[in-house]
């Protein structure tokens, strides 16, 4: 039987990158997915690809609590529950030393990652049945502290704290809460960060980052999605308050 047979999954940031790769894998494993994001055209394209029998979408900026509440309600009205929640929306912020970092960008980066994840959990948890799974996409930077990306690092560490509290609160209902920590992953999102960090063209920037990874290469979105599947499925029935790194050894 498919590992997510008849499961309903909400994924924020589901229109591209890791979120879309996760949606594809989950649908192939028997799930129905409700995708939430800010790009309506990409969301519609994702639903068309996955099939309307298997997917739906809603537009919301996760920093807007009312918008999140509406997006969650739309999915709950259609499916009745969310067996799995993947809080995956994110932005990269600036690349600059702390003394030069724009305060408004710092605040926005924390808002998307931390306040956004809080909004998603706050409004989805009432629709998660006992024994469900909540996954927050953190980052390898939620385990280490590279220079130049202070807002992103702070936000990704903060998500771990939110996860740990939620895991304790929801344990009596056997709802598991975990973070996943991708290392550099081959997506346009990562390409942009690397080019700004290195001031190199994309291919050269990627090689510079490959050199930081003990296993010598970027992960693919599909490899991160496999980690998502583990945390979403019954295979991880006794895994909660855990930080799952898929980073080629970068955080080791």
Q: Which residues are covered by each model-predicted region?
A:
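Conserved glycine-rich cofactor-binding loop
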Residues: 15-16
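Short, small/polar-rich loop/turn modules that mediate ligand/substrate recognition or access, typified
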Residues: 171, 176, 239-241
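Active-site helix of classical SDR
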Residues: 121, 155, 163
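The beta1-alpha1 cofactor-binding region of Rossmann-like NAD(H)/NADP(H)-dependent oxidoreductases
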Residues: 40, 59-71, 103, 222
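Substrate-binding pocket helix/loop in short-chain dehydrogenase/reductase
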Residues: 96-98, 102-107, 209
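Short C-terminal tail/terminal secondary-structure segment
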Residues: 92-95, 217, 228-229, 236, ...
């Amino acid at each position: 039987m498919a590992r997510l047979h008849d499961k309903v999954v909400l994924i924020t940031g589901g229109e591209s990158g890791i979120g879309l790769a996760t949606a594809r894998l989950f649908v192939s494993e028997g799930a129905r997915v409700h995708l939430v994001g800010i790009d309506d055209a990409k969301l519609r394209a994702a639903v068309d690809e996955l099939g309307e029998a298997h997917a739906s979408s809603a537009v919301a900026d996760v920093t807007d609590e009312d918008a999140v509440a509406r997006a969650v309600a739309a999915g709950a009205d259609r499916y009745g529950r969310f067996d799995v929640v993947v809080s995956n929306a994110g932005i990269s912020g600036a690349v600059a030393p702390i003394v030069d970092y724009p305060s408004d960008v710092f605040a926005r980066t924390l808002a998307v990652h931390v306040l956004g994840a809080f909004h998603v959990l706050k409004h989805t948890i009432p629709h998660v049945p006992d024994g469900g799974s909540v996954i927050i996409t953190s980052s390898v930077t939620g385990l280490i502290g590279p220079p130049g990306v202070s807002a992103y690092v702070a936000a990704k560490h903060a998500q771990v704290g939110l996860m740990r509290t939620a895991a304790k609160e929801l344990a009596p209902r056997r709802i598991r809460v975990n973070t996943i920590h991708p290392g550099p992953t081959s997506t346009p999102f990562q390409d942009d960060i690397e080019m700004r960090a290195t001031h190199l063209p994309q291919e050269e920037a990627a090689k510079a980052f490959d050199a930081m990874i003990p296993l010598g290469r970027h992960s693919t979105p599909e490899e991160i999605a496999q980690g998502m599947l583990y945390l979403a499925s019954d295979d991880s029935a006794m895994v909660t308050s855990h930080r799952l790194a898929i980073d080629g050894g970068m955080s080791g």
